[in-house]
């Protein structure tokens, strides 16, 4: 009958593992039980099977590599366990030996008493000792191997004490080999313990009992080793110059210190505490306030006074702080704790303690029914007996449903009687939405809490709050904040971060700005970073050389490594001197300025709020010329848009309205949509930065919901609206409503609040901010009027005649717009811009732009294209149509140029690297001439081009 206790190797250490004890009854009443190890590392499953002739055997099945501790019995006569650990002829023989040993039944249960109490570190020591035995080739584990295991474990109390005495693993191994030498090399799978080692394990159990511990750790093993006093381990310690009595003293001292730390950390409670449950599941805010660990609370005087008034009531003395997230509800409770700590409160609450309850900790670990209720009742009983406790529950709506299982009641219902009778003074805090969703649904709970509204502070109040918090953030980030930075944080967060609330968003701004400035000053110099990169490469090459046993190369790499480390140290020292000089020059080190706050806001929102640089100033002043490179003519529209952008960029626009809102009216193909694209590409980064809504998709009444999102219960409710979601993601953008007259009239009703207030509420009730968007609507209304009056507008008229004609047409188009759109819609627009019809001269300039696009596409294929003046005139003649604008021109270029080029490229007459000239012959036919052949399509170059004037 063989027994073994199997231990997993270190990779299997981890929480939540255990050994399940299996009891097995032998014949004739001999009862034994497998060791139920409590160490969090093992999972041994015992399986039982019956051998022939009635013998019963139990094997431990383990799904991992294992080490075994076998036949533990101590120094007395051999016991049943000693023989059970070895192969044996039969059960009756073993039982007789057990009877003849004369030991009590308790002595046979030593393994159970021992190993179920081993800590993770102690098990690791035993495993390491067996590994040391294998390394030395010994087929036993003695005291010397246990000593080596204690040193090798590295993290326990025993290892720390031995290290402090100057005892290391390398020297100890040398001493052990000097004394006992190396073994034969053949080591059995199961390595037994020597009698002295068994004695050490027994003594470690006694030491643990004397210290009042119900576990055996590495420190107890070391104490047992010292108490045994003889054996190889004692000689090793003596040779290394260690004093056993001194080691014992140090171990006991460290054990005592650890116990003190554990008592102070474990929930803050101690054996003498009158409120162990409260201290375990709560945090004493008053104590933190006395220690100065809470942030100062600025303002909020009316709210704190109202809370004190409610707390002084006889019944229902439970205030509930209600406000938006981030307005400072928790800060009011902390402010009350600070006032109590300083004595600045009425006598009704003087000397009381504010404790914040951690609901998550209270619920955590309550596996069985009744555990949560028991904890909560203990908590309430402690508060009732003390009569000096004010309980603060943040996110008080979590009470509803907390701990409720099938057939159980939740925390809110348990607390209701105490809240109503005044036995429990409780401050709750929750958001407006959660209060409506959870607490208002339960009128019985709602009447027990007295609501205290916590409004969002104004910008001026937020600035005062930031000034009060400045010192804490300066100490944390080791820098200074200027007054301008604090003012900018409050103002810019209020203006540009619309989905959050003051003062939280302003505090986050100064916090992140401080982090940015500190990291910027802490960066390594560029030279040091390069050297660090070289050092990593050299170290890698050195290690590879060592692995390949190229020691000469490894030596040269080592020398270079030393040189690089010295260079890095020199660079860092120089950098510190420079930084010190800069800090002295700046009078106090790094400083967070207004520009740092502006940069963080721009990073968060994508809105450029930094001060306008000189480069950007010149760019804004030259905006008209830049836009005219893409949009030909239409000076009025280009000037109006440029004025709006300049106004917004310097901060002179109305902060409660969009940057600008225009309606572009004119005939088709004159550049209405092209101007919006050009503006998006020039100022907002790219054409993709524009939100384009084709209003022909919103012709039916029900499609209006696509803009703001479907109502609840309809398909697409969770996806949000096309307009609102796009603006929420990119608040600084251009929104183009193309062909606005095609939309259903209800769309215009929805746009009224966008144009006036710069805001829109989506289907989920969230407010979307349009204050940083540029709204452009295009329309073809009035195009018939422009077409009729266009005959009197042309390049053959003088300047005054053209202006008067344009003004007359603009007034006519405006009248048509008034007939089509409602007055309240048109009245909210900043400007109604009428686009002129294109003249032939303007069409010629547009032809240049379109031909350049074709040239650019051919350059990708390494083909150089030139066109003559005659060809360009031919394109303009065919593509000019005042009624249709520039779109016929695109069709003419496609037909005359692109089709001819495509045919020649497919026939391989034009290949990569060719230079191509496109001209028109005397008969008006298009001729494509290649620079490599000189003749393409049957015409010589000199015949076709009498006077070629390439423009591109």
From Swiss-Prot:
<feature type="domain" description="UVR">
    <location>
        <begin position="532"/>
        <end position="567"/>
    </location>
</feature>
<keyword id="KW-0143">Chaperone</keyword>
<dbReference type="InterPro" id="IPR003593">
    <property type="entry name" value="AAA+_ATPase"/>
</dbReference>
<feature type="region of interest" description="Repeat 1">
    <location>
        <begin position="118"/>
        <end position="183"/>
    </location>
</feature>
<dbReference type="GO" id="GO:0005739">
    <property type="term" value="C:mitochondrion"/>
</dbReference>
<dbReference type="GO" id="GO:0009941">
    <property type="term" value="C:chloroplast envelope"/>
</dbReference>
<dbReference type="GO" id="GO:0009532">
    <property type="term" value="C:plastid stroma"/>
</dbReference>
<feature type="domain" description="Clp R">
    <location>
        <begin position="115"/>
        <end position="257"/>
    </location>
</feature>
<feature type="region of interest" description="II">
    <location>
        <begin position="592"/>
        <end position="783"/>
    </location>
</feature>
<dbReference type="Pfam" id="PF00004">
    <property type="entry name" value="AAA"/>
</dbReference>
<dbReference type="Pfam" id="PF07724">
    <property type="entry name" value="AAA_2"/>
</dbReference>
<dbReference type="Pfam" id="PF10431">
    <property type="entry name" value="ClpB_D2-small"/>
</dbReference>
<comment type="subunit">
    <text>Homodimer and homohexamer. Hexamerization upon addition of ATP. Interacts with CLPT1. Interacts with CLPS1. Stably associated with the import machinery. Interacts with CLPF.</text>
</comment>
<keyword id="KW-0150">Chloroplast</keyword>
<dbReference type="InterPro" id="IPR019489">
    <property type="entry name" value="Clp_ATPase_C"/>
</dbReference>
<keyword id="KW-0677">Repeat</keyword>
<feature type="region of interest" description="Repeat 2">
    <location>
        <begin position="193"/>
        <end position="257"/>
    </location>
</feature>
<feature type="binding site">
    <location>
        <begin position="323"/>
        <end position="330"/>
    </location>
    <ligand>
        <name>ATP</name>
    </ligand>
</feature>
<dbReference type="InterPro" id="IPR018368">
    <property type="entry name" value="ClpA/B_CS1"/>
</dbReference>
<keyword id="KW-0067">ATP-binding</keyword>
<dbReference type="Pfam" id="PF17871">
    <property type="entry name" value="AAA_lid_9"/>
</dbReference>
<dbReference type="InterPro" id="IPR004176">
    <property type="entry name" value="Clp_R_dom"/>
</dbReference>
<dbReference type="InterPro" id="IPR028299">
    <property type="entry name" value="ClpA/B_CS2"/>
</dbReference>
<keyword id="KW-0547">Nucleotide-binding</keyword>
<dbReference type="GO" id="GO:0009570">
    <property type="term" value="C:chloroplast stroma"/>
</dbReference>
<feature type="binding site">
    <location>
        <begin position="666"/>
        <end position="673"/>
    </location>
    <ligand>
        <name>ATP</name>
    </ligand>
</feature>
<dbReference type="InterPro" id="IPR036628">
    <property type="entry name" value="Clp_N_dom_sf"/>
</dbReference>
<dbReference type="GO" id="GO:0009536">
    <property type="term" value="C:plastid"/>
</dbReference>
<dbReference type="InterPro" id="IPR041546">
    <property type="entry name" value="ClpA/ClpB_AAA_lid"/>
</dbReference>
<feature type="region of interest" description="I">
    <location>
        <begin position="278"/>
        <end position="525"/>
    </location>
</feature>
<keyword id="KW-0378">Hydrolase</keyword>
<dbReference type="InterPro" id="IPR001943">
    <property type="entry name" value="UVR_dom"/>
</dbReference>
<dbReference type="InterPro" id="IPR050130">
    <property type="entry name" value="ClpA_ClpB"/>
</dbReference>
<dbReference type="GO" id="GO:0016887">
    <property type="term" value="F:ATP hydrolysis activity"/>
</dbReference>
<keyword id="KW-0934">Plastid</keyword>
<feature type="transit peptide" description="Chloroplast">
    <location>
        <begin position="1"/>
        <end position="45"/>
    </location>
</feature>
<protein>
    <recommendedName>
        <fullName>Chaperone protein ClpC2, chloroplastic</fullName>
        <ecNumber>3.6.1.-</ecNumber>
    </recommendedName>
</protein>
<keyword id="KW-0809">Transit peptide</keyword>
<dbReference type="GO" id="GO:0009507">
    <property type="term" value="C:chloroplast"/>
</dbReference>
<dbReference type="InterPro" id="IPR027417">
    <property type="entry name" value="P-loop_NTPase"/>
</dbReference>
<keyword id="KW-0472">Membrane</keyword>
<dbReference type="GO" id="GO:0005524">
    <property type="term" value="F:ATP binding"/>
</dbReference>
């Amino acid at each position: 009958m063989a027994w073994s206790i199997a231990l997993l190797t270190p990779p299997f250490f981890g929480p939540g593992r255990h050994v399940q004890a299996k009891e097995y009854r032998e014949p004739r009443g001999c009862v034994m039980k497998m060791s139920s190890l409590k160490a969090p590392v093992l999972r041994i499953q015992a399986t039982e099977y019956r051998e022939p002739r009635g013998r019963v055997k139990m094997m431990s099945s383990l799904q991992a590599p294992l080490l075994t501790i076998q036949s533990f019995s101590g120094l007395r006569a051999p016991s049943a366990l000693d023989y059970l650990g070895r192969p044996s002829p039969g059960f009756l023989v073993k039982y007789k030996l057990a009877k003849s040993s004369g030991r009590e039944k308790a002595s046979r249960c030593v393994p159970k008493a021992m190993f179920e109490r081993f800590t993770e570190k102690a098990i690791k020591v035993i495993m390491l000792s067996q590994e040391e035995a294998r390394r030395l080739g010994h087929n036993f584990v003695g005291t010397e191997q246990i000593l080596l295991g204690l040193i090798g474990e590295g993290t326990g109390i025993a290892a720390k004490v031995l290290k402090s005495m100057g005892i290391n693993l390398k020297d100890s191994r040398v001493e052990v080999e000097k004394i006992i030498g190396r073994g034969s090399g053949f080591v059995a799978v199961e390595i037994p313990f020597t009698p002295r080692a068994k004695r050490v394990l027994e003594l470690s159990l006694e030491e643990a009992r004397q210290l009042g511990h119900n576990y055996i750790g590495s420190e107890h093993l070391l104490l047992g080793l010292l108490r045994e006093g003889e054996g190889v381990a004692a000689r090793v310690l003596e040779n290394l110059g260690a004093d056993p009595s001194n080691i014992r003293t140090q171990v006991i001292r460290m054990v005592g210190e650890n116990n003190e730390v554990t008592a102070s950390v474990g929930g803050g409670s101690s054996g003498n505490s009158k409120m162990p449950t409260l201290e375990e599941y709560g945090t004493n805010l008053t104590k933190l306030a006395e220690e100065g660990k809470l942030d100062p609370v600025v303002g909020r005087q009316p709210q704190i006074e109202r809370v004190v008034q409610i707390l002084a009531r006889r019944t229902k003395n439970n205030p509930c702080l209600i406000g938006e997230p981030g307005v400072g509800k928790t800060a009011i409770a902390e402010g009350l704790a600070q006032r109590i700590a300083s004595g600045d409160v009425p006598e009704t609450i003087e000397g009381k303690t504010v404790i914040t309850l951690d609901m998550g900790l209270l619920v955590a670990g309550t596996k069985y029914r009744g555990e949560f209720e028991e904890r909560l009742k203990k908590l309430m009983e402690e508060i009732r007996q003390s009569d000096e406790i004010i309980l603060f529950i943040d996110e008080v709506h979590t009470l509803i449903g907390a701990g409720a299982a099938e057939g159980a009641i939740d925390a809110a219902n348990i607390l209701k009687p105490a809240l109503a009778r005044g036995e429990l003074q409780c401050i709750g805090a929750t958001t407006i939405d959660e209060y409506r969703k959870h607490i208002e649904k339960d009128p019985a709970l709602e009447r027990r809490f007295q609501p205290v509204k916590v409004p969002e502070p104004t910008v001026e109040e937020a600035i005062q709050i930031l000034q009060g918090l400045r010192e804490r953030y300066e100490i944390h980030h080791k820098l200074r904040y200027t007054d301008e930075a604090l003012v900018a944080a409050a103002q810019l967060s209020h203006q540009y971060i619309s989905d959050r609330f003051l003062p939280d968003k302003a505090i986050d701004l100064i916090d992140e700005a401080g982090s940015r400035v500190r990291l910027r000053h802490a960066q390594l110099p560029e030279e040091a970073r390069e050297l660090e990169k070289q050092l990593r490469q050299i170290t890698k090459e050195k290690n590879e050389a060592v692995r390949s046993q190229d020691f000469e190369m490894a030596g040269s790499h080592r020398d270079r490594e030393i040189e690089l480390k010295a260079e890095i140290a020199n660079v860092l020292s120089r950098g510190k001197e420079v930084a010190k000089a800069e800090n002295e020059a700046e009078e106090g080190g790094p400083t967070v300025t207004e520009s740092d706050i502006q940069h963080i806001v721009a990073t968060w929102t994508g809105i450029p709020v930094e001060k306008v640089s000189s480069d950007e100033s010149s760019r804004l002043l030259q905006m008209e010329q830049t836009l005219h490179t893409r949009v030909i003519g239409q000076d009025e529209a280009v000037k109006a848009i440029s004025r709006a952008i300049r106004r917004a960029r310097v901060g002179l626009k109305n902060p409660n309205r969009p940057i600008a809102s225009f309606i572009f009216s004119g005939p088709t193909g004159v550049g209405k949509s092209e101007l919006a694209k050009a503006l998006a590409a020039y100022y907002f980064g790219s054409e993709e930065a524009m939100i384009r809504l084709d209003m022909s998709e919103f012709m039916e009444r029900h499609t209006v919901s696509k803009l703001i999102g479907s109502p609840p219960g309809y398909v697409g409710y969770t996806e949000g609206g096309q307009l609102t979601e796009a603006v929420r993601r990119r608040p600084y953008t251009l929104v183009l409503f193309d062909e606005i007259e095609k939309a259903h009239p209800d769309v215009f009703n929805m746009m009224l609040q966008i144009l006036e207030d710069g805001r829109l509420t989506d289907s989920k009730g969230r407010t979307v901010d349009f204050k940083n968007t540029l709204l452009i609507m295009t329309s073809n209304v009035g195009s018939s009027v422009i077409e009729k009056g266009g005959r009197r507008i042309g390049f053959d008229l003088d300047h005054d005649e053209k202006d008067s004609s344009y003004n007359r047409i603009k007034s006519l188009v405006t009248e048509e717009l008034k007939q089509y759109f409602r007055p309240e819609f048109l009245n909210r627009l900043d400007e109604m811009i009428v686009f002129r019809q294109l003249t032939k001269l303007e069409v010629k300039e547009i032809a240049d732009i379109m031909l350049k696009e074709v040239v650019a596409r051919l350059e990708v294929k390494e083909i150089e294209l030139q066109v003559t003046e005659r060809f360009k005139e031919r394109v303009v003649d065919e593509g000019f149509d005042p009624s249709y604008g520039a779109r016929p021109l695109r069709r003419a270029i496609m037909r005359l140029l692109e089709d001819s080029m495509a045919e020649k490229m497919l026939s391989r007459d034009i290949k990569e690297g060719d230079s191509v000239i496109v001209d028109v012959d005397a008969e008006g036919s298009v001729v494509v001439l290649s620079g490599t052949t000189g003749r393409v399509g049957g015409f010589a170059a000199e015949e076709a081009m009498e006077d070629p004037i390439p423009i591109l």
